Amino acid sequence: MTSKNPIQKALYLTFERAQWSELRDSVPLTLSERDLENLRGINEKVSLSEVTDIYLPLSRLLNLIVKSKQQRGLVLDEFLGQKPFHSPYIISIAGSVAVGKSTTARVLQALLQHWPEHPKVDLVTTDGFLYPLADLKRKGLLQRKGFPESYDMKMLVEFISAVKSGQPHTKAPIYSHVTYDRVRNQHQIVSQPDILILEGLNVLQTGLDSPVDTRRPFVSDFVDFSIYVDAEESLLKQWYQERFLQFRKGAFSDAKSYFHHYANLTDDEANAIAANIWDTINGPNLQLNIQPTRERAHLILQKGQDHLMSHVLMRK
């Protein structure tokens, strides 16, 4: 996967799994198997060895980068003769549906908050910034859910701008995967974290590839370090179908679930519906909007079979 892409060869240093794991440099493992169980997503197989080989070196890299940014901030404050200004370091995590962005974000949050330089690490997903279900239906965007135009980008940019500017309390809307909708009158409060992890499909997008107004700022303008979780599309489709089957047995069985009508499908019926959703919505969104932003990331995590990381690509 890595050797066939000339752009990646030009822009990135490529590490095989074993090479990357050596960069851990004795960073202690602070997660137990029980901790990891709480962090895993549906159909995710991330193990303690995956944490040790991939995520501990990454947390060490991010710690060094954040410390450097903090030290630079102190130098600027001294030069300008002003009181220290607290601006959260913002990490974005992008990638396709079913690639495991959420698990990556949760594991990184758990590891990064153990470093003394940045103990307060918040995690926000962009799902909450999807337009409410009623608005999507009214705009004719229900079959485009997850595409850039299905997000309230003005609200998302205002949120990330407020966090970056050091606002003491900033509200983020909460999304329910049961009702398939934004939760009314409930918010996540972000209160001046040391690090904010922002996870979502389109967080690497810029005005170059936006189908909407390009004159306004984009989320990527506020991000300090960006990560793209990558995999071949054939694997992504397979993982999406497997996850759909898991949801059918779990979340879809809830009578309140928007997808409750899928709960009694046979395996063959569920696989066919999941494949169609991929081919008509998730696949085109990946090809048109998500994958083209991949080479903007500072770091690419490449997955192979069984969700295992095979390579790490780091910007030169």
From Swiss-Prot:
The gene is coaA. The keyword Cytoplasm applies. It is an enzyme of class 2 (transferase). Pathway: Cofactor biosynthesis; coenzyme A biosynthesis; CoA from (R)-pantothenate: step 1/5. It catalyses: (R)-pantothenate + ATP = (R)-4'-phosphopantothenate + ADP + H(+). It is found in: Cytoplasm. One of its GO terms (molecular function) is pantothenate kinase activity. This is Pantothenate kinase. It comes from Shewanella sp. (strain W3-18-1). ATP binds at residues 95-102. Its EC number is 2.7.1.33. Belongs to the prokaryotic pantothenate kinase family.
